[in-house]
């Protein structure tokens, strides 16, 4: 019996939305317009967010990401880094901090699927969030793996627990601030 979990639903969604985005999927503005057209045609409310190198298509229960930065395509992109880092977190026992990322290859492109989480809706740094404090062990693990961009747009909560959703690493050292808030 085939499961109908968020990953399976995301794969079906990718197959359905791909014709809308394939023409210019490495341009975030074009993807945004294509998703608007998809929403009209299928009466959906799918959102698009993008950063410096990745596009995230957000539905009600999952997120589909892909790299669009030319350097990311030629080298290991941020989405692939997230898969590698998640695997390392599983090995080290820190996977509870992260949304699981899985890869789905379709029509020669790699898409990355993760569950949707509840955002916090206001700008807060994960290290000083009033409702959650990372342990020193968790901070040390994040520092050792160059996770330095953990602001409110990159994490949220799932089932009452913190969940990091954007965890591609940045190659530089970071000094922890032990300030009280």
Q: Can you describe what each PLM-predicted range is?
A:
Residues 138-145:
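Protein kinase catalytic-loop region centered on the HRD/HxD motif
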Residues 2-45:
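Juxta-kinase regulatory segment immediately upstream of eukaryotic protein kinase catalytic domains
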Residues 146-181:
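Catalytic activation segment of kinase domains across protein kinase-like and atypical kinase folds
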């Amino acid at each position: 019996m085939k499961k109908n979990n968020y990953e399976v639903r995301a794969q079906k969604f990718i197959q359905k939305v791909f014709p809308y985005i394939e023409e210019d999927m490495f341009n975030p503005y074009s993807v945004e317009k294509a998703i608007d057209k998809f929403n009209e045609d299928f009466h959906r409310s799918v959102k698009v967010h993008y950063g410096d190198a990745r596009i995230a298509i957000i539905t009600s229960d999952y997120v589909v990401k892909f790299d669009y930065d030319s350097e990311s395509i030629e080298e290991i992109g941020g989405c692939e880094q997230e898969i590698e880092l998640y695997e390392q977190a599983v090995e080290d026992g820190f996977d509870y901090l992260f949304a699981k990322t899985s890869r789905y290859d379709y029509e020669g492109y790699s898409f990355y699927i993760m569950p949707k989480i509840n955002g916090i809706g206001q700008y807060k740094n994960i290290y000083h969030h009033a409702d959650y404090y990372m342990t020193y062990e968790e901070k040390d693990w994040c520092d050792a793996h160059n996770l330095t961009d953990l602001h409110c747009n990159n994490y949220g909560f799932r089932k009452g627990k913190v969940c990091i959703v954007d965890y591609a690493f940045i190659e530089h050292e970071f000094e922890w601030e032990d300030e009280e808030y």
